[in-house]
Regions:
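Acidic/His-rich, metal-assisted hydrolase cores and their charged scaffolds
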Residues: 1-608
Length: 608
């Protein structure tokens, strides 16, 4: 059994398992931190960004590099459409992948790169919420990029400028493998290969293994995957949470006693408590708008954003600020709010109970009807300008601050110290994200809310699950670089532990010792057991082993006619000898049968 790691980011995982002649891909995470090396794409023309000075490395000696870089506050950025870090493509041929198992909508954004124009002919499995919300994430990304096209594409910097530049996140893999975003046509074609599954539903993969999904508690429809053969069990854990939020809670039972546990997507902010961060977030927002300032919250169109709506609206009610408007800007804003209310079966029991009252599981439906939460597809949408007034709270994408409506508000509110931008998504470093907007007077704060398993929670869970082998990213066995003394921020296990990095191949010591074989009824009728002791019978049999669609079946031998060319004049025995021979008893029975002068002699090789 082998595991091939295709990603350098544990929270945007992608790996391939080779097991029983099948290739199973776990997740297709798209690492977007590479976009931090590019200039933002403003929806409205930004004079400041347009007038940034060009930058060319003196030692480059390549005239074609001119115009590919711009400098902002001492930092250099690529002036081109942003590019994304793909999963490793040289380790495995995507055409050979049999199935792709997606854990959650955050881990599927690279799917079109894997399934389109690669010869992929397999099946993609995911839950219904993952498909619906994942499509929204992809649609939002495509819309952000396509509505702000760049007049030219910078390409020479990859070949010539890396030795002169220290762009952010260059350790994500070779920038030459970075790619611009796919199209909606690619998205639709890729998602047409998806088969929706439910929790605990078992899918057969070519008769070799079965795969099933169980709730992971991280987000709507998120799951952990269980791969089972007749005598082996592999568990893949990605994006799991033991916190009580809006998704259905994590299921532990089916994950226990695995031959191998593959663990990814632990918290990116091990020093930040989600509840504490949420409380500080609400207090800061309320204080800012009370002082007449505006609050900008870069966000995704789903996930923690729902919890922010709920907690923030409740806090503003307690502080008497119910008239402060909240704007939700995303090309998929209205669909996102609608889907969250119709996917009741995937919610926690507390949220499900509200559906049967009947009542909306989330308060944002009531907030929209009451005019407190206002969804718009864009700042250019009809009615937005007339409705917009300050002070206000704006939720907008993208959290990288490189594209989306958030770029406009960074430019608009940046000069005022009364305003604040608050980062709650842990995917992007605050300092690198705001770098092209510096210098700015607006305050930038970070209250990361990551509900993924912490290291303490993960260690406790591993002790409970008792896997034989644990396979995880190398980063999880080392303390954070900024806290080298924090030995509690690593994964420790009593079982065999193996680590992986991007491009590595891990050999998991799970040996196949048994194979399931089915016996036909006809052959079973010919079996005559002999009881060797109370409750235990043994029988010998003769049959032919047939393998079809990776299933083994034992059938009676076909009778060959005596004149057939295949017949060799011999027939297989109907019974076989077994066990140890009692020589004394054997001699006694020979004597009883009329054989006289029976003698037994001991020799070096046995008895005669």
């Amino acid at each position: 059994m082998k595991l091939l790691c295709l990603s350098s980011n544990p929270n945007k995982p992608c790996s391939v398992l080779k097991f029983k002649n099948t290739l199973i891909m776990f997740d297709c995470g798209l690492d977007a931190t590479s976009v931090l090396g590019f200039l933002p794409l403003p929806l409205v023309l930004s004079t400041r960004l347009s007038n940034l000075p060009l930058w060319t490395p003196r030692e480059a000696g390549d005239a074609q590099l001119e115009g590919e870089f711009k400098e902002a506050n001492g930092r250099v950025f690529v002036d081109s459409a942003p590019e994304f870090c793909l999963p490793e493509t040289g380790l495995v041929d995507f055409a050979d992948i049999d199935v792709i198992l997606i854990s959650n909508y955050q881990s599927m954004l690279a799917l079109p790169y894997v399934t389109e124009r690669t010869g992929f002919k397999g099946t993609v499995y995911m839950t219904e919420p993952t498909l619906l919300i994942g499509r929204q994430f992809m649609e939002e990304l495509v819309t952000y990029i396509e509505r702000t096209p760049k007049p030219r594409t910078a390409t020479r910097w990859k070949q010539h400028a890396l030795k002169f530049l220290q762009l952010p996140s260059l350790d994500l893999g070779k920038p030459r493998s970075w790619r611009q975003l796919y199209s909606m046509q690619d998205v639709n074609s890729s998602l047409s290969k998806v088969k929706v599954v439910g929790f605990a539903e078992k899918m057969d993969v070519f008769g070799m293994v079965q795969v099933s999904a169980v709730s992971s508690g991280y987000c709507l429809g998120s799951c952990n995957w269980i791969v089972t053969a007749d005598h082996e069990k592999i568990v893949y854990m990605s994006g799991s949470s033991t916190l009580t939020t809006h998704p259905k809670p994590i299921e532990h039972g089916p994950l226990r006693n695995a031959d191998a546990l593959i663990l990814t997507s632990l918290t990116q902010t091990p020093l930040a408590n989600p509840d504490t961060m949420l409380g500080e977030f609400c207090i800061t927002v309320a204080m800012t708008v009370k002082m007449g300032g505006n609050v900008l919250i870069p966000c995704y169109p789903s996930g923690v954003t729902y919890d922010l709506f709920e907690c923030l609206s409740g806090h503003l009610e307690t502080t008497g600020q119910v008239n402060v408007p909240m704007y939700f800007l995303s090309p998929v804003a209205e669909n996102s709010l609608a889907y969250s209310s119709i996917l009741a079966e995937w919610l926690s029991s507390a949220k499900q109970a509200k559906v049967y009252i009947p009542e909306e599981p989330f308060p944002h439906a009531q907030l929209v009807r009451g005019g407190r939460l206002k969804p718009f597809p864009s700042i250019k949408a009809e009615g937005f300008t007339a409705d917009f007034h300050t002070p206000c709270i704006v939720f907008a994408g993208h959290p990288s601050l490189r594209f989306g409506d958030v770029v406009h508000f960074m430019e608009l509110w940046g000069p005022s110290p009364n305003n604040v931008v608050i980062f709650t998504e842990p995917d992007f470093n605050l300092a690198e994200a705001i770098a092209p907007f510096q210098p700015m007077a607006m305050k930038a704060l970070c209250f990361p809310i990551d509900t993924s398993l912490s290291f303490v929670q993960a260690n406790k869970l591993i002790r409970d699950l008792k896997p034989t082998n644990l396979v995880l990213p190398l980063q999880y066995t080392l303390p954070p670089p900024l806290q080298p003394h924090r030995s509690d921020l690593v994964i420790e296990a009593e079982c065999e532990v193996q680590t992986f990095t991007r491009g590595s191949i891990v050999h998991i010591p799970v040996q196949r010792r048994y194979q399931r074989i089915e016996m036909t009824a006809e052959l079973a009728e010919s079996v005559v057991p002999v009881e060797v002791k109370c409750g235990l019978g043994i029988a010998t049999l003769t049959g032919a082993l047939h393998v079809n669609n990776n299933r083994c079946t034992l059938k009676p031998l076909q009778k060959e006619p005596s004149g057939s060319k295949k017949w060799n004049g011999q027939t297989p025995p109907k019974i076989y000898t077994w066990g140890n021979l009692d020589v004394t008893e054997f001699a006694r029975k020979l004597d009883k049968a009329g054989f006289t002068d029976v003698k037994v002699e001991n020799t070096a090789s046995g008895m005669i």
